[in-house]
């Protein structure tokens, strides 16, 4: 083999390597050897600065002094001692060494590995990367490269001709992305990977979608013409073409090797799809029982401006080596146009390369000129090889250009005139490569013409099939595979009383098992007293508090074969030290999970996340997309912090099914409640979630219709039993919907907040509205009715009892969206003598449920057309931060609540 030898063939340490530099028989030989070694290190660390990686030659090429021979007292043509371990014996003089290093690090591909901590990884990477210059593609590989380039160019040209004003975000100037993807797919199949999950933005997405991932071109053209991507009878609003997804099986090596590729849906919120793709990959690995990542690979494609500018990229990279989120490494390809809309690199980042973002996790970085598709093909193979060996992320920075503006109707010369003068003079990458291999006699002009005409004819034929008289929808794939047997909610009958109960005897066993530990496992004494023993004492009274109900819900689902994954900050213990799914041995820090040791069919995955909301929630959403057989739960430390993940809520959780027909049963737990903790620890902003609900405010015939058309469920439960049923309902249904829970804080230990196990027995179900237990038997005497939701009920109940307001009924709305019209009507009918109605909430008037419930009460029910608001006045912040004022507000709220 010609090339630089491995630093660490036998996993030598730095010390042993350094020692070999100095241990020679001759001082002069030792000096030369050390100097050459330092020169090699200089090229490896700084050669990238001088590399020819920018096809537009806009990036300054910097020749570091560390590449100068004079710095090491070396001269051109100098002989090399044969005792130098790092240099192959075929390289006998310094000129050969320099030529080798120049080709490896200063040509149209370069690398940065110096920041990597692992000596073994660096040694492997240096050896493999330096070998690439002597690995020339075969004739068939070159033809394959050309065909991928030409197919991309033909697609862009066809679209420009047929739809000249359509914003397709074409790949012209970076067609080598297609070469990279093809190489990654092939190498994945060769390595017996079963799945590649792709998260990518708009640039080049349509090229990949149609020309490589087999999305039917006729369906695509039909959509571009303004038609729906959904066949008749499918409920959904759809999305733009640059967000469309596809799954396909790709065959290679004469159909001897294959890989399943999933290009998942994305929003235009750049990089938000990254953690979604990672989460879906993790779920695939879980179901394949190969958590090491040996069978499923995540491929993320990025734009150069977005990867440097969007914080979710850093959040996602930070997850890459955490045990609860590790997916065995991800291959990143940056489709680098050297511009973001109109933002030039000097305004878009503070470092030289957009790929520098990967250095903080020690990711290898390979930068390649997009005009060198053969190099692109080679480094893409190397990326998969590295990922398979070391199970870590690796980044390819593919530097090209963008032929048009951000979209095809944009004029880029308004802001980048000289850049686009350069671009418009350039031969396209496909045509340049075609000229190259035609000159090599590998492909003829006639073959190129025939291939081009064939591909154009295929697109034209598909275009004709997209006309109204010819078009037929391809089979929909949204409820196939693991999701077969489920339905869209529009097809459900009334499931408002769906039985979600479970055997009382088994629930008691689960609750007992939830605090059972091995005999040699020492639990903290205070925890043993206040948690474990307290739970067992409650069970003797047939009672369960909030955390016990949660354990019973999770445990019973596991008994039925469902898996449960709960993720978030401190979820193993719980923010309020209430959950303790993880117990810690006091002498060894060993973790024990009782629910995973009770012999259930399903598994519980408890993931204490890092301090991220956005990426982690997106990750869990992605996890939820893979299978309906896992209950995915994400809990915020406090509900207030959910706005750190607002993009995830808006673009994925509440709208994903409507846009993309992808169901998710994710549960989002948001501790909420006004207890004097101030603006950052009081409110999950209920009002914002309710504003996202797509349920009708008026013209509603019955609750069945509402359940059929809702995009998610929002509940504010006030009893452990109702929380128990809500969690189980998520899995017992034959469809999946996101569930947002305004969860409790003080109710976790409130003496009156408990449920009996009989309330969770077979035949019981989630109660959308809870009747007033204190007035249900004397309803005719009630003159005033309070409607409320959440923990404020307990304050109102206590005040009513203390002040003997016996003519007031208090009705709890446990489910706010979809709005339980019929159940509310039943309660109104129950109190037929009531003449006054009020909505009472602890939130401010411009928060909480009021803006959502007001039009529904006033327009649906004649009796409540004059319903009164009782609560805090409007506030700019979510809560008062002055404790004395908070206490006064609580007192005033209770006074007002019973004086209307």
UniProtKB/Swiss-Prot annotation:
InterPro entries: 2oxoglutarate_DH_E1, DH_E1, KGD_C_sf, ODO-1/KGD_C, THDP-binding, Transketolase-like_Pyr-bd. It catalyses: N(6)-[(R)-lipoyl]-L-lysyl-[protein] + 2-oxoadipate + H(+) = N(6)-[(R)-S(8)-glutaryldihydrolipoyl]-L-lysyl-[protein] + CO2. It comes from the Eukaryota. GO terms for cellular component: mitochondrion. Keywords: Glycolysis, Mitochondrion, Oxidoreductase, Thiamine pyrophosphate, Transit peptide. Its EC number is 1.2.4.-. GO terms for biological process: glycolytic process. SUPFAM superfamilies: Thiamin diphosphate-binding fold (THDP-binding). Its cofactor is thiamine diphosphate. CDD domains: TPP_E1_OGDC_like. It holds the Pfam family Transket_pyr. It is found in: Mitochondrion. GO terms for molecular function: 2-oxoadipate dehydrogenase activity; oxoglutarate dehydrogenase (succinyl-transferring) activity; thiamine pyrophosphate binding. Belongs to the alpha-ketoglutarate dehydrogenase family. 2-oxoadipate dehydrogenase (E1a) component of the 2-oxoadipate dehydrogenase complex (OADHC). Participates in the first step, rate limiting for the overall conversion of 2-oxoadipate (alpha-ketoadipate) to glutaryl-CoA and CO(2) catalyzed by the whole OADHC. Catalyzes the irreversible decarboxylation of 2-oxoadipate via the thiamine diphosphate (ThDP) cofactor and subsequent transfer of the decarboxylated acyl intermediate on an oxidized dihydrolipoyl group that is covalently amidated to the E2 enzyme (dihydrolipoyllysine-residue succinyltransferase or DLST). This is Probable 2-oxoadipate dehydrogenase complex component E1 homolog. It comes from Dictyostelium discoideum. The lineage of its organism: Eukaryota, Amoebozoa, Evosea, Eumycetozoa, Dictyostelia.
